[in-house]
Amino acid sequence: MTYCLRIADIPTNERPRERLMTHGPKVLATAELIAILLGTGQGPGKLSAVGLGQYLLQELGKNQRDPLAVLREVTPAELMQIPGIGPAKATSILAAVELGKRTFQFRPLDKTPIDSPVAAVAALSQDLMWQNQERFAVLLLDVKNRLLGTQVITIGTATETLASPREIFREIIRQGATRTIVAHNHPSGNVEPSPEDIELTRQLLAGAQLLGIPLLDHLILGNGNHQSLREVTTLWNDYPQGD
C-alpha cells in the first residue's frame, strides 16, 4: 500500500475499512487501524490516512520506544505536537485507547465460574493488566471454582514485586477461599515467566499441597497479553493439586 495515496485512490478491496469489514480487524496493520480512527490524512508530504498513521507510529517510536506502549499513556498535547494531528484526530485516538483499556477492565460478577485462564484474566485485568508497577494478586474461589473476589497482595516497583507464600496463603485463608489462582503483572508487556516466577510457583504449589488449598494456576499479565504457567510448565505434574 502506498502511503502517499489518498484512500479514495486505493483499490476498494485494499482500503482499511473495507478490509476490516471483509476480513476482520486482526488482519489490519496498526497503521491501518489508526487510519480508520483518523478518517483523513495530511501531515508531512500530504500523507494518506494510512501514511499519517504510519508517521504517527514512527514519531511515537523515537528513541527506540515501543510506539504502542507510548500510545497507551500519551497526552492530547503530545499527540498534537505531531504534524497532521489536531484536536479532532487526537481525541479520536485517545477515546479508542481508553475504550480498549476499559474492555480489559471488565470484572465478572461474584460467583462466576472461573474455568479457564481467559476467565481468570478477565477477573484480574482491572487490578493488573495496565499497571505501571508490578502487582501480585489472588483470585479467591470456592470449591466449585466460583469467584468469591480478588485481592491485591503486594505492589512493587516498575520491575519487581515482593510476595511471599506466607502473605499469599494468609490472605487466602483469611478470606475463606478453598481454591485459588495467583497472578502478577509485568509492566514491560513481556509475559514470559522469569526464573523467580518459576521458583515462587514451585513454593506456592508445595504450600497448597500442605494446606489442602488447590492452586489452579499462576498467571502473568501485561499490556493486553497473558501467560498461564500451568500451560507452559510441568510444575503441576510435579505438585499435583487434586483438582
From Swiss-Prot:
SMART domains: HhH1. Pfam families: RadC, UPF0758_N. The keyword ATP-binding does not apply. Keywords: Hydrolase, Metal-binding, Metalloprotease, Protease, Zinc. A motif (JAMM motif) lies at residues 184-197. One of its GO terms (biological process) is DNA repair. Disulfide bonds: none annotated. CDD domains: MPN_DUF2466 (cd08071). NCBIfam families: PRK00024.1, radc. This is UPF0758 protein Ava_0172. It comes from Trichormus variabilis (strain ATCC 29413 / PCC 7937).
